[in-house]
């Protein structure tokens, strides 16, 4: 593989960890080992969510934050979890792209691909916060119980939990970033990166973060496909590009704070006044 941002071995290590809702402990252990290796402050809350902090910001500055969820819906992986074994990852190349899957068990790249991208950014950036939630697939039960005080010095959140190369401009009917952000960066994003669709994501962790913190958020496509099925797979090059987009956005947004009062309009995206930005 010729990946510019993601480390191939880290990719295989993350994707091979079996994890299912309410059985995320093997991935938690992996994350804690990662934190020790890369000198990242790590904490675990009572719910089981994992919080990372790397580096220090100046007075009055804010941390960029990335997030993903640790659980998957692939119940067949319980066999591997109970035996403390790693999944067997199958890699196939087609038209210059590398497809990763786990035959018969479902890969669980929703959202281990997002976890991988967050870890990649942690390796490459000197200052960053990251949070990894449990039980997103059960109704965002982890993010609903997040330690809100931990976000007091966070300026914005980039989530990596949208399928394929789709990005979410809204979640549950509420805008994730303000209009000025899209006016400033949408053209550049379209020029520099592949964004197949902009969507109004129905339900994910950043909906609760938006509601509870008023922080601006964005949900970036994590390169996984056929999610929630045994045939789920991810494309290495698409995950790599998602990591590049994350680095680009953090460079542009910097250590500033972006707040948007949460208003859930719960309307179809096609009826939103902002929709024309994404057509």
Predicted segments — roles?
Residues 101-180, 198, 276:
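Acidic/histidine-rich catalytic neighborhood of metal-dependent amide-processing enzymes
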Residues 197-242:
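Zn-dependent metallopeptidase/amidohydrolase metal-coordination segment
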Residues 170-213, 262, 266-267, 279:
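An extended, acidic, His-containing surface patch that forms the Zn2+-binding/catalytic region
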Residues 31, 115-122, 209, 246-249:
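Buried hydrophobic packing segments
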Residues 226-279:
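His/Asp/Glu-rich mid-to-C-terminal helical/loop segments that flank catalytic regions of hydrolases
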Residues 36-41, 48, 59-62, 121-129, ...:
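Short glycine/proline-enriched coil/turn segments at helix->beta-strand junctions
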Residues 2-97:
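Acidic/His- and Gly-rich active-site-bordering loop/insert found
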Residues 63-67, 155-159, 217-219:
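Short glycine-aspartate micro-motif
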């Amino acid at each position: 593989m010729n990946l510019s941002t993601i480390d191939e071995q880290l990719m295989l290590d993350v994707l091979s960890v079996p994890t299912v809702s309410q059985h995320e402990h093997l991935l938690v252990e992996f994350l804690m080992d990662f934190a020790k290796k890369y000198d990242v402050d790590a904490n675990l809350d009572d719910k089981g969510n994992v919080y990372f902090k790397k580096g220090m910001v100046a007075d009055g500055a804010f941390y960029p934050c990335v997030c993903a969820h640790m659980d998957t819906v692939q119940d067949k992986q319980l066999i591997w979890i109970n035996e403390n074994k790693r999944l067997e990852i199958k890699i196939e190349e087609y038209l210059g792209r590398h497809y990763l899957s786990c035959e018969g068990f479902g890969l669980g790249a929703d959202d281990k691909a997002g976890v991988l991208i967050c870890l990649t950014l942690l390796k490459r950036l000197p200052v960053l916060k990251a949070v990894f939630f449990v039980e997103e697939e059960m109704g965002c039960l982890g993010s609903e119980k997040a330690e809100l005080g931990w976000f007091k010095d966070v300026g914005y959140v980039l989530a990596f939990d949208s399928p394929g190369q789709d990005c979410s401009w809204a979640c549950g009917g509420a805008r994730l970033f303000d209009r000025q952000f899209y006016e400033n960066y949408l053209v550049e994003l379209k020029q520099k990166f592949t964004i197949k669709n902009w969507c109004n994501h129905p339900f994910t962790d950043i909906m609760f973060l938006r509601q509870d913190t008023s922080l601006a958020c964005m949900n970036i496509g994590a390169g996984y496909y056929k999610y929630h099925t045994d045939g789920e797979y991810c494309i290495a090059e698409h995950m790599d590009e998602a990591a590049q987009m994350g680095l680009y956005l953090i460079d542009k947004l910097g250590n500033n704070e972006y707040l948007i009062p949460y208003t859930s309009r719960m309307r179809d995206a096609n009826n939103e006044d902002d929709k024309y930005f994404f057509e």
